[in-house]
Swiss-Prot record:
This protein's name: Pseudouridine-5'-phosphate glycosidase
The record's free-text note on cofactor binding: Binds 1 Mn(2+) ion per subunit.
UniProt-listed GO biological process terms: nucleobase catabolic process
Residues the entry annotates as binding Mn(2+): D136
Organism of provenance: Mycoplasmopsis agalactiae (strain NCTC 10123 / CIP 59.7 / PG2) (Mycoplasma agalactiae)
Length: 301
């Protein structure tokens, strides 16, 4: 398979320095231009300041890129024909030399293949509301269960059924570690009514858990990192707006891949931009923690 590494990432992997994988759908589908470029470059710099190397993963003209130069991020952010790429899409996107923004599951898949054990994102996908009828369950959860990658996130997106998402993760053997929290963060909000599997208190503790688990068995780990309080939105406030967005999606017949981008856009409108700022801040926070964990894991190896 043709995978191109940036010089920075190639050197880091060769010398076993800490690397943090980053998805690209947050650039291609998650935020408007030029906010997406600004956020992506800031995330990379946050990771570098913590002593790790950022590796944004994307598909450009049918070639998987692990690590992007600044001009490549800028070009990717402006493209209109980018395919949201999870495991099922790789064959089509690669064979037809298309452009792809890798989802959480797509990024986990590539990270595992190239040996990057830490990945930072905003929030994971999960079990959609009404999944008992629609069977709409994100590929993220299955990919996490089979690949040795730690995903640092602010929990699952609040547009999902958080309770069922946790149940599914338990079935798949994926632990959800709360970073200095007993409760699952709810993306825009720092807490929810749901409990995490274990509360952990430091990057070194997380790194030790990664090492111990993967010495014994395979499978991903979620580090649920709450959005800093000063940037978080009230749980009931954001939940109310999400419910309104979900009802509107039903009216407009939105389904499948289009659901998440539609709902995030609608929530942005309903919260008058507050959700976008919260989204950016939680991604920054996750990048910082992921880099700290990657540094500790590199020491323990």
């Amino acid at each position: 398979m043709n995978i191109v590494f940036s010089k920075e990432v190639e050197s880091a992997l060769k010398h076993k320095r800490p690397v943090v994988a980053l998805e690209s759908t947050i650039i291609t589908h998650g935020m408007p231009y030029p906010k997406n470029v600004e956020m992506a470059l800031n995330v990379e710099n946050i990771i570098r300041k913590q002593g790790a190397v950022p590796a944004t993963i994307a598909i450009i003209n049918g070639i998987i890129h692990v690590g992007l130069e600044n001009d490549e991020i800028n070009e990717l952010a402006k493209l209109k024909d980018v395919i949201k790429t999870s495991k099922r899409d790789f064959g089509y996107v690669l064979a037809n030399k298309k452009n792809g923004g890798t989802t959480v599951s797509g990024t986990v898949l590539v990270a595992q293949k190239v040996g990057i054990p830490v990945f930072a994102t905003g929030g994971i996908g999960g079990v959609h509301r009404g999944a008992e009828i629609t069977f709409d369950i994100s590929r993220d959860l299955d990919e996490l269960s089979t690949n040795n990658v730690l995903v640092v996130c602010a929990g699952a997106k609040l547009i999902l059924d958080l309770g069922l998402t946790l149940e599914y993760l338990e079935t798949k053997g994926v632990e959800v570690l709360g970073y200095n929290s007993d409760k699952l963060p709810a993306f825009y909000s720092s807490s929810s009514e749901f409990n995490v599997t274990y509360n952990v208190h430091s990057a070194s503790e997380v790194a030790a858990i990664m090492k111990a688990k993967w010495k014994f068995t395979n499978g991903g780990i979620i580090l649920a990192n709450p959005i800093p309080e000063q940037y978080g939105l009230e749980y009931e406030y954001i939940l109310d707006n999400i419910n309104k967005a979900i009802e509107q999606a039903k009216v407009e017949g939105i389904s499948g891949k289009k659901t998440t981008p539609y709902l995030l856009s609608k929530v942005l409108e309903l919260t008058e931009g507050k959700s976008l700022e919260a989204n950016i801040q939680l991604v920054y926070n996750n990048a910082k923690v992921a880099a700290q964990v990657a540094v500790e894991y590199a020491k323990q190896k």
